[in-house]
């Protein structure tokens, strides 16, 4: 059987992102999203869950955007003079203290569990989990909170060796120049048996998103493709089961 998890990263970043998640669930193939717990609209998770009962919510561990949930004094090697995370991953973490990374990851996990929705998995913004200073704390916290995780080509071997549950295949090519309907249909046509995650970033683009994310215009295109009638029909015709990370728990 082919089990497909289409996950929307960046839930909570803006209202337009959250609105895009709802749209792609109700009228498209999205069944999973991951929450940026340090962002202003993360608290909309329960409200969205009521609109989208089968939507899975993961944690999008964020270490290079916005402010930490920990007090700046506790994670001073992660922040700039204004108290924001240092920008420019991966080099932004070059001088980071691994214990401080662990502290902040756990704060974000605790925030996620306080939002009133069942947490299905954990992944990370800009694949920060693959950084040599992050991966061990990421694995430790996933074990502690019994969470399946996304695995990328850079960290899959270590994640599997650690005994964490993860998908069989992770597809990250539906992004930027790869945001085309024919590309998504090609990806769907090449799905292997087992579990596959396709990473996505759908949204309604508003001024807030334009001001904080360089990746914004393509989010509108993603939203339209993920709700395209040809894509929906392909899923039906090929017996692909849409699901979320709860299938791994």
Swiss-Prot record:
The keyword Secreted does not apply. Signal peptide: none annotated. This is Carbohydrate deacetylase. Pfam families: YdjC. It comes from Thermoanaerobacter pseudethanolicus (strain ATCC 33223 / 39E) (Clostridium thermohydrosulfuricum). Its EC number is 3.5.1.-. Probably catalyzes the deacetylation of acetylated carbohydrates an important step in the degradation of oligosaccharides. One of its GO terms (biological process) is polysaccharide catabolic process. GO terms for molecular function: deacetylase activity; hydrolase activity, acting on carbon-nitrogen (but not peptide) bonds, in linear amides; metal ion binding. Its cofactor is Mg(2+). It is an enzyme of class 3 (hydrolase). InterPro entries: COD_ChbG_bac, Glyco_hydro/deAcase_b/a-brl, YdjC-like. Mg(2+) binds at residues 60, 125. PANTHER family: CARBOHYDRATE DEACETYLASE, YDJC DEACETYLASE FAMILY MEMBER. HAMAP family: COD (MF_01246). Homodimer. Keywords: Carbohydrate metabolism, Hydrolase, Magnesium, Metal-binding. The keyword rRNA-binding does not apply. Belongs to the YdjC deacetylase family.
């Amino acid at each position: 059987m082919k089990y497909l998890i289409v996950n929307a990263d960046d839930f909570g970043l803006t209202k337009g992102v959250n609105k895009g998640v709802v749209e792609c669930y109700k009228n498209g193939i999205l069944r999973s999203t991951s929450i940026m717990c340090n962002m202003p609209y993360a608290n909309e998770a329960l409200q969205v869950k009521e609109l989208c009962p089968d939507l899975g919510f993961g944690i999008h561990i964020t270490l290079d955007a916005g402010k930490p949930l920990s007090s700046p004094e506790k994670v001073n090697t992660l922040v700039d003079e204004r108290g924001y995370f240092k920008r420019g991953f991966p080099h932004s973490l070059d001088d980071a203290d691994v214990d401080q990374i662990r502290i902040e990851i756990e704060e974000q996990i605790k925030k996620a569990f306080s939002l009133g929705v069942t947490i299905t998995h954990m992944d990370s913004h800009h694949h920060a989990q693959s950084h040599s200073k992050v991966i061990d704390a990421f694995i430790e916290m996933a074990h502690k909170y019994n969470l399946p995780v996304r695995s990328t080509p850079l960290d899959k071997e270590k994640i599997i060796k650690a005994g964490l549950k993860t998908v069989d295949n992770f597809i990250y090519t539906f992004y930027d120049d790869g945001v085309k309907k024919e590309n998504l249909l090609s990806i769907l046509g090449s799905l292997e048996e087992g579990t596959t995650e396709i990473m996505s970033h759908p949204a309604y683009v508003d001024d807030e998103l334009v001001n904080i994310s360089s990746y914004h215009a393509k989010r509108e295109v993603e939203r339209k493709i993920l709700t395209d009638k040809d894509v929906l029909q392909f899923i039906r015709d090929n017996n692909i089961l849409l699901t979320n990370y709860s299938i791994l728990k």
